[in-house]
């Protein structure tokens, strides 16, 4: 069932690589983190933000959906969304914004049946004088 074997193998190989190549210390930069097996930009940015307190913009399914739906960005991929959000949001607010977008996506701006009628953003958001996709 599922990808548990694959995930377990990646966790094991990542742990070995951290022990062998990084003296048991989790890397604190995007380049080294993304060299670890199974670690992409999203995971690396979450680690940088949550474990190391660095400014980072992690784009998961909620961040991607919400930021595109409400018109902060107009992108087709998580990576393009990450860079567009980094341009649109002051660096000191990246990590906090990431968490707020996730929360909003889970509670109000859901993938199916978004609750636009109670969305506090919809009525105020105007990007380049265009209405949001919810309106």
List each language-model region with its residue ranges.
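Catalytic cores of DNA base-excision repair glycosylases
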Residues: 1-133
